[in-house]
Design a protein with these regions (language model features):
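Intrinsic disorder/low-complexity detector
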Residues: 7-9, 50, 60, 86, ...
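Long, contiguous binding/interaction regions
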Residues: 2-10, 31, 35, 89-91, ...
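Intrinsic-disorder/low-complexity, polar/charged segments enriched in Ser/Thr/Lys/Arg/Asp/Glu/Gln
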Residues: 12-16, 75
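A detector of low-complexity, intrinsically disordered, Ser/Thr/Gly/Pro/Ala-rich segments
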Residues: 1-2, 16
Length: 104
């Protein structure tokens, strides 16, 4: 399940995404996530809601995304702030919902 909220100022948006990919956000899916986030000017942060004390990390950093250790079934909070925040969250939501391009 995916939920998306856009703030009233339209310069901020967030989504809670459930990762269904069998490998979670391991190397290839994480790289696709970072590549997608990096297309946008907005500051994009991610945090694993399924793990206690998960840090909020830069979603444009492969090391940051790997640090949150997202496994299959985990819920990921993604927040964007900037002029293209809504578009960024939409693209990341589509990537996760599309299982990172995998048919499995």
């Amino acid at each position: 399940m995916t939920t998306t909220d856009a703030d009233a100022d339209a310069d901020a948006a967030e989504a809670r995404l459930t990762v269904s990919h069998p490998a979670g956000l391991h190397l290839r899916p994480a790289a696709l996530f970072v590549q997608t986030a990096s297309r946008f000017a907005s500051d994009i942060r991610a945090r694993n809601l399924s793990r206690d004390n998960s840090p909020e990390v830069n979603a444009k950093s492969i090391l940051g995304v790997m640090q949150v250790a997202v496994s299959q079934g985990d819920q990921l909070l993604v927040r964007a702030h900037g002029t293209d925040a809504v578009e960024a969250i939409g693209a990341l939501t589509a990537l996760v919902a599309g299982n990172f391009g995998d048919s499995a």
